Design a protein with these regions (language model features):
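Extended, charge-rich alpha-helical interface modules
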Residues: 2-71
Length: 71
């Protein structure tokens, strides 16, 4: 029988890890091809925004691990 609580928490962590991968890839693109991103003339600000998004998703994973997976 599937434990719904554990399944929901696992899926939330998978979702946040996907967001981290997405924003990490965006940073890599900015670092390797900054001239290819026409709508972002301020590459540093764009990278900062991506890193903030990574930090938010990482923090949510840490909250799940600390508050909901410890029994």
């Amino acid at each position: 029988m599937i434990n719904l609580r554990d399944e929901i928490l696992k899926n939330q962590k998978t979702y946040y890890n996907g967001l981290i991968a997405k924003h990490q890839q965006n940073v890599e693109i900015y670092l390797n091809q900054p001239v290819g991103i026409g709508e972002h003339s301020d590459v540093m600000a764009a990278i900062d925004g991506e890193i903030n998004a990574i930090a938010q998703a990482h923090e949510k994973i840490e909250i799940i691990n600390h508050y909901f997976l410890v029994r």
